[in-house]
């Protein structure tokens, strides 16, 4: 089980698509529970812990204390990267995966996250590499209208700083689109098609590029997986700073997401929210309902929900069409299975954009 732990609701950025810090009344900026509660969970089951915010590194002392006291199998952190240089290299050795928020090329990242942010995140990635960090460094993109999926993903891979690139679409919870349908038709889907070909061509030459959504879809295609693919409420739970146990880390004010609290003596919080129409869909094995929050809230209504389903299916169909070719490359020893099927455990990569 992965536990996504809010270390604080505070953030040191105010990105265009999320607005910065969480309101204190929903996600307090200080921890309101004892770390002993986390130790009790770790005694009952094998757990991984992902530190989340706000900006999680703003509460670095809490992170250090959890690492010291809670016997988790693996530690993960999702960070904007601005405070990476404030921590000793030995601190980073505790983490199996580090996700750095960066949206692609400099102009796009700075447009959404603030002037100079691209350079600071790239600097953070360099610091990790030069310190000898050997874990998984993931470029975590938020993709919106100024982005170009092919350009931005290939750019980040070309830096040789990131093992994997993952993106999430800024859809459903945002109305800040001039013409979403046109963007999907003329930018996103042509870019996805081009990126799939680029991925396949590199594999034919013996290189597996770390394009996380493609790898995750292929892995689910072969091995299956939980629904939704991020694991929300099935093999991932979130713990807010006030001790509430949530189905999803961004559903901090939705009543449906409140499963329990750390004070309750409840042993199993798992539940499955994803039902029809997703469970009847022919891509459910790969898609798993895509996103629990989007499934439950449907801010764009049924039409918007269905439009996102359609281009998600297109992405899955593209990977399906290449499945046999990819597996043949594995069987011939051209590429290695352990490089291809990613992630090997729930490391907070949502898989479906």
What is the meaning of each model-derived region?
Residues 250-353:
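Flexible mid-to-C-terminal extensions adjoining Fe-S/redox cofactors in radical SAM and related proteins
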Residues 27-33, 115-122, 126, 130-245, ...:
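Radical SAM enzyme [4Fe-4S]-AdoMet core and its adjacent flexible, acidic
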Residues 36-40, 44-50, 59-171, 181:
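Radical SAM/AdoMet-radical enzyme domain recognition
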Residues 21-25, 105-108, 172-175:
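A short, flexible beta-alpha/helix-coil linker loop
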Residues 6-14, 55, 233, 278, ...:
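Cysteine-centered iron-sulfur cluster-binding motifs in ferredoxin-type domains/subunits
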Residues 13, 107, 246, 289:
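Glycine-centered loop/turn positions within well-structured domains
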Residues 22, 53, 102, 169, ...:
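Residues that line or immediately flank small-molecule/substrate-binding pockets and catalytic motifs
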Residues 1-33:
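Canonical Radical SAM [4Fe-4S] cluster-binding loop centered on the CxxxCxxC motif
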């Amino acid at each position: 089980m992965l536990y996504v732990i809010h270390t604080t609701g505070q953030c040191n950025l105010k990105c265009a698509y999320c607005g910065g810090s969480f309101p204190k009344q929903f996600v307090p900026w200080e921890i309101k529970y004892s770390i002993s509660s986390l130790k009790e969970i770790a005694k009952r089951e094998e757990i991984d812990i992902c530190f989340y915010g706000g900006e999680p590194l703003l509460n670095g002392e809490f992170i250090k204390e959890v690492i010291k006291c809670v016997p988790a199998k693996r530690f993960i952190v999702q960070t904007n990267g601005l405070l990476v240089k404030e921590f000793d290299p030995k601190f980073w050795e505790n983490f199996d995966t580090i996700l750095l928020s960066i949206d692609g090329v400099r102009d796009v990242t700075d447009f959404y996250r603030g002037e100079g942010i691209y350079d600071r995140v790239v600097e953070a990635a360099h610091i990790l590499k030069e310190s000898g960090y050997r874990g998984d460094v993931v470029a975590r993109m938020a993709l919106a209208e100024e982005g170009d999926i092919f350009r931005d993903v290939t750019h980040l891979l070309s830096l040789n700083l990131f093992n994997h690139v993952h993106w999430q679409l800024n859809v459903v919870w945002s109305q800040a689109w001039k013409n979403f349908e046109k963007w999907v038709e003329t930018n996103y889907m042509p870019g996805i098609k081009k990126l799939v070909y680029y991925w396949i061509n590199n594999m034919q030459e013996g290189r597996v590029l770390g394009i996380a959504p493609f790898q995750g879809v292929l892995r689910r295609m072969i091995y299956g997986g939980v629904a939704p693919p991020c694991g929300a409420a099935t093999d991932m739970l979130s713990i807010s700073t006030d001790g509430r146990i949530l189905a999803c880390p961004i559903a901090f004010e939705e009543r449906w997401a409140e499963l329990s609290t750390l004070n309750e003596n409840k042993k199993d919080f798992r539940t499955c929210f994803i039902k029809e129409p997703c469970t009847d869909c022919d891509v459910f094995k790969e898609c798993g309902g895509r996103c629990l929050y989007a499934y439950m809230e449907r801010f764009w209504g049924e039409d918007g929900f269905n439009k996102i389903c359609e281009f998600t299916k297109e992405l899955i169909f593209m990977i399906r069409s290449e499945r046999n070719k990819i597996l043949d490359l594995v069987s011939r020893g051209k590429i290695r299975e352990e490089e291809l099927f990613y992630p090997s455990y729930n490391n907070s990569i949502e898989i479906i954009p």
